[in-house]
């Protein structure tokens, strides 16, 4: 099918800790890489010990908004990047990431990449928006 990743615990579909563990096991049994969303610094800490490839830090209050996590929570991104790195995980950040500058700031703060949705889907030219964000990550 070409499926390579499983995105778990997004703020629009939060699941219990037991469901997270079961979902990770199910994904791993299918050789999928796992992206586990964390809504807080505490969750980043807790989830970094699990068998996942990526932790995606996305504060729910910023999702779909005009304020980027990269500019509003730089200290948490730095700390989350350190926690992830110490545990062999890569950090993604999302929430309000809409511009090349937002994406570049996330990487400079220690993130390996970004999660985007409304910033691309709702753009006048989604392809151009996506290309601009990708340019910042290369």
Question: What do these predicted regions represent?
Answer:
Residues 1-17, 55-67, 109-130:
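Glycine-rich phosphate-binding active-site loops on the catalytic face of alpha/beta enzymes
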Residues 3-4, 30-34, 51-53, 87-91, ...:
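Short, well-ordered coil/turn segments that N-cap beta-strands
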Residues 20-23, 49-52, 69-72, 106-109, ...:
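Short, glycine/charged-enriched secondary-structure capping and boundary segments
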Residues 34, 42-52, 121-122, 126-131:
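Conserved N-terminal beta1-alpha1 strand-loop-helix module at the mouth
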Residues 36-51, 93-114:
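Catalytic cores of alpha/beta
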Residues 59-62, 81, 89-96:
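Catalytic-face loop-and-helix region of soluble metabolic enzyme cores
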């Amino acid at each position: 099918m070409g499926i390579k990743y499983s995105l778990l615990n997004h703020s629009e579909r939060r699941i219990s800790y037991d469901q997270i563990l079961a979902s990770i096991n199910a994904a791993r049994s299918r050789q999928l890489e796992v992206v586990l969303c964390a809504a807080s610094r505490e969750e980043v800490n807790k989830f970094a010990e699990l068998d996942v490839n990526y932790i995606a830090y996305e504060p729910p209050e910023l999702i779909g908004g005009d304020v980027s996590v990269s500019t509003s929570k730089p200290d948490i991104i730095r700390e989350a990047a350190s926690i992830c790195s110490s545990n062999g995980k890569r950090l993604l950040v999302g929430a309000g990431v809409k511009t090349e500058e937002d994406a570049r700031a996330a990487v400079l703060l220690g993130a390996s990449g970004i999660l985007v949705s409304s910033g691309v889907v709702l753009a006048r030219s989604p392809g151009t928006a996506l290309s601009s964000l990708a340019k910042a990550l290369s």
